[in-house]
Amino acid sequence: MIPVALYGVDAALCERFFEALPKLVNDAYEDRSYIEALYAVEADHSIEHVRIADQWSNRDPYAWPEDIVNEVEMVLRTTVYPDVALLEHLMTLDGVDAQRISEWMHFSTNLFPIYSEKACKTLQAMGLDTPYRPDDIASYGLYVSRIEGLKLHAPAAGLPEIGLPRTRMLQLGLERFE
């Protein structure tokens, strides 16, 4: 049964995606910078996760006053997967958009997917209206629900068990699928 988050999906294309997925991501463990960043994250240092994510994505490091740092840390700690509503407040910070927030949340939780324009285009091709709008946290929320739907719908052999977050495998697979 197809999850509600995948309502309208081209079922044949979705099945073809899952058949191809293991080969599409078989080199995921070769991305040393991603793996080093992923395993550099420590449980109770959520503001450090922001630095790690920014470094991994080659972004300029943040330079916020202490009150903003505390606010960001509070939002990161209180946001519960898959809800992205609390993250909207972070979009008011200079240089922060849904793409950047998704990277922070991915490295902080290993649950949230990294927002990707290529992945959104593949989801669109599968019949799932999933716009890529980095200036709109709701569009990221829709992307999160689509990825969660794919996780729920994945056949046993569709998601390789290679020790990396399933959301990362799906994101990479969607980016590489043709």
For every predicted segment, state its role.
Residues 97-98:
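Small-residue hinge/turn detector
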Residues 62, 112, 177-178:
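Short helix-capping/linker segments at secondary-structure and domain boundaries
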Residues 48-94:
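Helix-hairpin-helix/helix-loop-helix acidic hairpins
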Residues 103:
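Cytochrome P450 catalytic-core helices
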Residues 1-50, 54, 116-178:
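C-terminal accessory module of base-excision DNA glycosylases/AP lyases that mediates lesion recognition
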Residues 106-117:
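Catalytic Zn2+-binding segment of zinc metalloproteases
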Residues 94, 108, 123-127:
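Short, well-ordered alpha-helical segments in soluble proteins
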